[in-house]
Amino acid sequence: MANNMIACRKSFTDTLLELARQDKDIVAVTTDARGSVTLGDFAKELPAQFVECGIAEQDAVGISAGLAHSGKKVFVCGPACFYVARSLEQVKVDLAYSQNNVKILGVSGGVAYGALGATHHSLHDIAVLRTFPGMNIVLPCDARQTRKLVKLLVDYPEPVYVRVGRAAVPDVYENDDFEFVLGKANTLLDGTDLTIIAAGETVYHAYQAGLMLREKGIQARVLDMSSIKPVDVEAIRKAAEETGRIITVEEHSRFGGLGAIVVETLSENPVPVRIIGIPDENVVHGNSHEIFAHYGLDKEGICKTALEFVKK
């Protein structure tokens, strides 16, 4: 695993700028957030393809839908906590229901805002958006996967919600020799003792936990489930059948997210599942690393849960 440290938001907007130089139909929309979403270079170089809406997320989604309806390839970018709360009706009606080709980039997702607290965390986004017919959801795990995702999304005809964090993250993938397909999981480690399924920035921790478990004689399968909707049902069922136990890891509420998707998928042929996520409480204050450690989302916490799980 490579040691490069690049923020997924930066990888996303850098790739978008590269593509937009060649495709004048690509438009970036934001809400007084060009700094936090790293769209400053895009705005300076391609002002005719950039729309600044100010702090008006509802308007931004509506404007984006209108631009998409006129044939533009629109990426509306801003803090995840606001796009899946303040502008939720517009996302539901103008994007999902109307099937307008708009991609939402929600930055600083999950607990990335750290000490800013519960008002700025987005721990409900998967649970809410996956109930909207026609809405796709992706949580890329590193800069390389994010770059592949942007290239795929430019010509993808349906609305997609992409959630990334804030800080630079280690590469999960050592090079570009891997596929990224919506609806397909990638197997990072294979094993038969249990399966760990993760999405977004928790994938790195799941992979590291898998390596730690190997040192203890436990062969864990680790799945990168960055495509949340559509989800790889076949990979989940195969993991249940072949390993008999599943742990899910998500920077999201334990309700309605990745863990719930796995349990729902296996409802007719269930196996024991442990969901590592945020419980039904306002998140403790701290930076994202401290919060991950507190709730067992880091590699040490995942490894501990796995060791306890296989002993039962």
From Swiss-Prot:
Known catalytic reactions: apulose 4-phosphate + D-glyceraldehyde 3-phosphate = D-xylulose 5-phosphate + dihydroxyacetone phosphate
Alphabetized SUPFAM superfamilies for the sequence: Thiamin diphosphate-binding fold (THDP-binding), TK C-terminal domain-like
Keywords: Carbohydrate metabolism, Thiamine pyrophosphate, Transferase
InterPro entries reported in the protein's UniProt record: PDH/Transketolase, THDP-binding, Transketo_C/PFOR_II, Transketolase-like_Pyr-bd, Transketolase_C
Residue ranges of coiled coil: none
Pathways per UniProt: Carbohydrate metabolism
Enzyme Commission number(s): 2.2.1.13
Cofactor: thiamine diphosphate
Organism superkingdom: Bacteria
Function: Involved in catabolism of D-apiose. Catalyzes the transfer of the glycolaldehyde group from apulose-4-phosphate to D-glyceraldehyde 3-phosphate, generating dihydroxyacetone phosphate and D-xylulose-5-phosphate.
Assembly, per entry: Probable heterodimer composed of AptA and AptB.
UniProt family annotation: Belongs to the transketolase family.
Name of this chain's protein: Apulose-4-phosphate transketolase subunit B
Biological classification of the source: Bacteria, Pseudomonadati, Bacteroidota, Bacteroidia, Bacteroidales
Gene: aptB
